[in-house]
């Protein structure tokens, strides 16, 4: 798999709980720990350091539909997320 861009999801968990690889973390395996997980996505980076979204109108995670694949890019974090067609926003803000 090609290398992930910064804060691009490296693994997506399927509805059945299977790990679906999306890209690689500069040759390392995609982490499997909670500090790298948001919703059903895992990221190469520790996501706990990503800043909290300031409002519920903000795009928290962009969904990028490529040819035969889908990518997720993290911009800011929420306490809970709301899914839209091409992005996730915050249903509930952190703090």
From Swiss-Prot:
Tissue: Expressed by the venom duct.
Keywords: Disulfide bond, Ion channel impairing toxin, Neurotoxin, Secreted, Toxin
Post-translational modifications reported in the UniProt record: Contains 5 disulfide bonds.
Any single Gene Ontology cellular-component annotation: extracellular region
GO MF terms, alphabetically ordered: ion channel regulator activity; toxin activity
Keyword Transferase belongs to the record: no
Domain statement: The cysteine framework is VIII (C-C-C-C-C-C-C-C-C-C).
Name this polypeptide is given: Turripeptide OL184
